[in-house]
């Protein structure tokens, strides 16, 4: 079994760019940014429970990493960068820290490196279980209307929230809930030490208005690019800013 993905081929000899979306996104999420880098071959992945991979369920990050590795092999991708947003960034960091043959580097936008104590994990598990129950049982428009009121999305205006609620409500609530629980921050290890000891290139992007993740970025041994006029979802709020940062990273 492999993950559903869209592949776009570029020039031979360059590494692939493998894009991983955030929670409730899909393979289209990164394409406005990724298609600027047409010299590189691009793979836009649907994570389990999402898009064309909605029917795929996992028990945790190890399963996600295994599926990602099989997917890369199936597309004959010898060397690559992982570019991930939020959940996709956490998947990228987890997979990279476990060791991936052919990995050139990781670019994470607004991805959490992991909680650092049992109290935080217990609280996060309680919160994610409540959200998962809502995703399973309530209309998605109602759930996402509340989801985008969370503090991390404080920089969004009303119009941006309405657009995101409409876009995300096309998902399957049950499969979103399953993925939310399987990849909760409550079950993700703290990756700070692994990332400090890494052997791969590691860059971090965060929105200028995303105070929570700017603070987290300062804790990581990574070169950080702050995206102007953007909050947590920087590549949606300021794609040109993310494109400029990615171009610098890739020396495009």
From Swiss-Prot:
Q: Which NCBIfam families match?
A: menH_SHCHC, PRK11126.1
Record's catalysed reaction(s):
5-enolpyruvoyl-6-hydroxy-2-succinyl-cyclohex-3-ene-1-carboxylate = (1R,6R)-6-hydroxy-2-succinyl-cyclohexa-2,4-diene-1-carboxylate + pyruvate
Q: Please provide the record's keywords in A-Z order.
A: Lyase, Menaquinone biosynthesis
Q: Which SUPFAM superfamilies match?
A: alpha/beta-Hydrolases
At the top of the EC hierarchy, this enzyme's class is lyase
Its subunit composition reads: Monomer.
Q: Which GO terms describe its molecular function?
A: 2-succinyl-6-hydroxy-2,4-cyclohexadiene-1-carboxylate synthase activity
Q: Look up the domain of life of the source.
A: Bacteria
Named in its record, the pathway it takes part in is: Quinol/quinone metabolism; 1,4-dihydroxy-2-naphthoate biosynthesis; 1,4-dihydroxy-2-naphthoate from chorismate: step 3/7; Quinol/quinone metabolism; menaquinone biosynthesis
Q: What does this protein do?
A: Catalyzes a proton abstraction reaction that results in 2,5-elimination of pyruvate from 2-succinyl-5-enolpyruvyl-6-hydroxy-3-cyclohexene-1-carboxylate (SEPHCHC) and the formation of 2-succinyl-6-hydroxy-2,4-cyclohexadiene-1-carboxylate (SHCHC).
Establish whether keyword Cell division is in the entry: no
Biological process GO annotation list?
Answer: menaquinone biosynthetic process
Q: What is its EC number?
A: 4.2.99.20
Q: Keyword Flavoprotein on this protein? A: no
The record's similarity note reads:
Belongs to the AB hydrolase superfamily. MenH family.
What is the name listed in the Swiss-Prot or TrEMBL entry for this protein? 2-succinyl-6-hydroxy-2,4-cyclohexadiene-1-carboxylate synthase
- From which source organism is this entry? Escherichia coli O7:K1 (strain IAI39 / ExPEC)
């Amino acid at each position: 079994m492999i993950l559903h993905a869209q592949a776009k081929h570029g020039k031979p000899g360059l590494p692939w760019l493998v894009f991983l979306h955030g929670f409730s996104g899909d393979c289209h999420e990164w394409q406005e940014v990724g298609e600027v880098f047409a010299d590189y071959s691009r793979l836009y992945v649907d994570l389990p429970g999402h898009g064309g991979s909605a029917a795929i369920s996992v028990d945790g990050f190890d399963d996600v990493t295994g599926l990602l590795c099989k997917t890369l092999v199936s597309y004959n991708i010898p060397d690559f960068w992982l570019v991930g947003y939020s959940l996709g960034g956490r998947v990228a960091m987890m997979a990279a820290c476990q060791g991936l043959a052919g990995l050139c580097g990781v670019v994470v936008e607004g991805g959490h490196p992991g909680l650092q104590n049992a109290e935080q994990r217990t609280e996060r598990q309680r919160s994610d279980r409540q959200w998962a129950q809502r995703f399973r049982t309530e209309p998605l428009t109602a759930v996402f209307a509340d989801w985008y009121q969370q503090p991390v999305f404080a920089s969004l205006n009303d119009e941006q929230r309405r657009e995101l609620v409409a876009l995300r409500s096309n998902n399957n609530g049950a499969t979103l809930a399953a993925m939310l629980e399987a990849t909760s921050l409550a079950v993700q290890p703290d990756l700070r030490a692994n990332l400090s000891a890494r052997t791969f290139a590691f860059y971090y992007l965060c929105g200028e208005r995303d105070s929570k993740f700017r603070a987290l970025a300062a804790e990581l041994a990574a070169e950080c690019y702050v995206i102007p006029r953007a909050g947590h979802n920087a590549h949606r709020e300021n794609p040109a800013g993310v494109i400029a940062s990615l171009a610098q990273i890739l020396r495009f």
